[in-house]
């Protein structure tokens, strides 16, 4: 048993313009090679494009997209008796949001398009509407968990 106490969970800081933690989480995942100002630029341009496309509050579109992509359950590989089973496990809200953000960014990077801001805005709008690669990834994960429901007792 470890003598150390449990680590405190850090809360995400909010970004300077929108004062939103979700925006900051997204910026930190867009970030490459420590270029945070570029990550902010990409996200703010994407938010502007969302504003132009939907003519609604872009933060509500962002929230709706992340809520739509957030998985409730996922599968985890568990080795039992020489064979590996995909065991369905429930996911907490923080981990679910992190997964959703990761899937949204992966889907937008895969998209054909001019620049990252354009691709990200398109993916976020699609996810808010309930379509797109990120939504497909969530549904696929849920299907996998449902198919492997028999192994839930290995948790």
From Swiss-Prot:
This protein's record includes keyword Transit peptide: no
Subcellular location, principal: plastid
Keywords from the named record: Chloroplast, Plastid, Ribonucleoprotein, Ribosomal protein, RNA-binding, rRNA-binding
Location(s), subcellular: Plastid, Chloroplast
CDD domains registered for this protein in UniProt: uS7_Chloroplast (cd14871)
InterPro entries xref list: Ribosomal_uS7 (IPR000235), Ribosomal_uS7_bac/org-type (IPR005717), Ribosomal_uS7_CS (IPR020606), Ribosomal_uS7_dom (IPR023798), Ribosomal_uS7_dom_sf (IPR036823)
Superkingdom field: Eukaryota
Disulfide bonds: none
Known function: One of the primary rRNA binding proteins, it binds directly to 16S rRNA where it nucleates assembly of the head domain of the 30S subunit.
Homology family: Belongs to the universal ribosomal protein uS7 family.
UniProt cross-references to HAMAP family, sorted A to Z: Ribosomal_uS7_B
Subunit note: Part of the 30S ribosomal subunit.
Name of protein: Small ribosomal subunit protein uS7c
Natural source organism: Cornus mas (Cornelian cherry dogwood)
Lineage, highest ranks first: Eukaryota, Viridiplantae, Streptophyta, Embryophyta, Tracheophyta
Gene of this entry: rps7
């Amino acid at each position: 048993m470890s003598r150390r106490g449990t680590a405190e969970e850090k809360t995400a800081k909010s970004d300077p313009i929108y004062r939103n933690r979700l925006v900051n989480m997204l910026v930190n995942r867009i970030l490459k090679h420590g270029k945070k100002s570029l990550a902010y630029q990409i996200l703010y341009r994407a938010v502007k494009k969302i504003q132009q496309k939907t003519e609604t509050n872009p933060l509500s579109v962002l929230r709706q997209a992340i809520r739509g992509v957030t998985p409730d359950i996922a599968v985890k590989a568990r080795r039992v008796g020489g064979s590996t089973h995909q065991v369905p496990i429930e996911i907490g809200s923080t981990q679910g949001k992190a997964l959703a953000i990761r899937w949204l960014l992966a889907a937008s990077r895969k998209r054909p398009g001019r620049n990252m801001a354009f691709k990200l805005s398109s993916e976020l709008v699609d996810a808010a509407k309930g379509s797109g690669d990120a939504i497909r990834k969530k549904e696929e994960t849920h299907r996998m968990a449902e198919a492997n429901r028999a192994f839930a007792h290995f948790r």
